[in-house]
Amino acid sequence: MIDYVSGTLVDKTTDSALVDVNGLGYRVHVPTSTYKRLPDTDEEVTLHTYHYLREDDESLYGFATKAERTVFETMTGVSRVGPKLALSALSAMTPTELRDHVMEGDKSRLTQISGVGTKTADRLIVELRDRLADLDVLEDTSPLSGGSDARAEARADALEALTELGLSKADAERSIRQVLRDNAGIQSADELVRRALKADQE
């Protein structure tokens, strides 16, 4: 199994990326959310991958975060939901939004995904609700090259601190996202916790 690819970004389109890894070129299918975070060509990039292997299909799918990959893999485990539909879902909404819509049974939102009708939405709600309930889907929306490690570490530490202070994981994630939308440069977990607590009380 290919768990990730890390190398030089040679080419990118809205649904794929070509990554050179020591002279080997890997064509990786990506959702729109990952495409938007890809660096310029000739820069280094790392993608978390899922190797889809069937008798009539062998493809590599790449994601900016492990959460996206987990959601993709979980969705492809649903009856009659293939990688194309799972990729379409992650192109239409974030892992957090997808999880929330499934947990809330929001069929009107789910049917906005290309290829998802009412019956498929019902199936997604029934089969994904338990699987996604405890999924940590806090997103890192920073670019996929350079400078994101400190920010990602601060988010993870802040999430842990906020849940220890009594917030639910969903509320903590929501507060952190709200803070980072208004203060994208924060890289201190302490500052993030302080502002997130304030946001949660407003």
Swiss-Prot record:
Record localization: Cytoplasm
Record's keyword terms, sorted: Cytoplasm, DNA damage, DNA recombination, DNA repair, DNA-binding
Residues of the signal peptide: none
Pfam family, any one: RuvA_C
Family: Belongs to the RuvA family.
Cellular-component GO terms for this entry: cytoplasm; Holliday junction helicase complex; Holliday junction resolvase complex
Major localisation: cytoplasm
Assembly and binders: Homotetramer. Forms an RuvA(8)-RuvB(12)-Holliday junction (HJ) complex. HJ DNA is sandwiched between 2 RuvA tetramers; dsDNA enters through RuvA and exits via RuvB. An RuvB hexamer assembles on each DNA strand where it exits the tetramer. Each RuvB hexamer is contacted by two RuvA subunits (via domain III) on 2 adjacent RuvB subunits; this complex drives branch migration. In the full resolvosome a probable DNA-RuvA(4)-RuvB(12)-RuvC(2) complex forms which resolves the HJ.
Biological processes annotated in GO: DNA recombination; DNA repair
Taxonomic superkingdom: Bacteria
Function: The RuvA-RuvB-RuvC complex processes Holliday junction (HJ) DNA during genetic recombination and DNA repair, while the RuvA-RuvB complex plays an important role in the rescue of blocked DNA replication forks via replication fork reversal (RFR). RuvA specifically binds to HJ cruciform DNA, conferring on it an open structure. The RuvB hexamer acts as an ATP-dependent pump, pulling dsDNA into and through the RuvAB complex. HJ branch migration allows RuvC to scan DNA until it finds its consensus sequence, where it cleaves and resolves the cruciform DNA.
Domains as described in the record: Has three domains with a flexible linker between the domains II and III and assumes an 'L' shape. Domain III is highly mobile and contacts RuvB.
Protein name, per record: Holliday junction branch migration complex subunit RuvA
Segments for region (Domain II): 65-143
Region (Domain I): 1-64
Region annotation Flexible linker: where it falls in the sequence: 144-149
MF (Gene Ontology): ATP binding; four-way junction DNA binding; four-way junction helicase activity
Region (Domain III): 150-202
InterPro entries: DNA_helicase_Holl-junc_RuvA_I, Hlx-hairpin-Hlx_DNA-bd_motif, NA-bd_OB-fold, RuvA, RuvA_2-like, RuvA_C, RuvA_C_sf
Lineage: Bacteria, Pseudomonadati, Rhodothermota, Rhodothermia, Rhodothermales
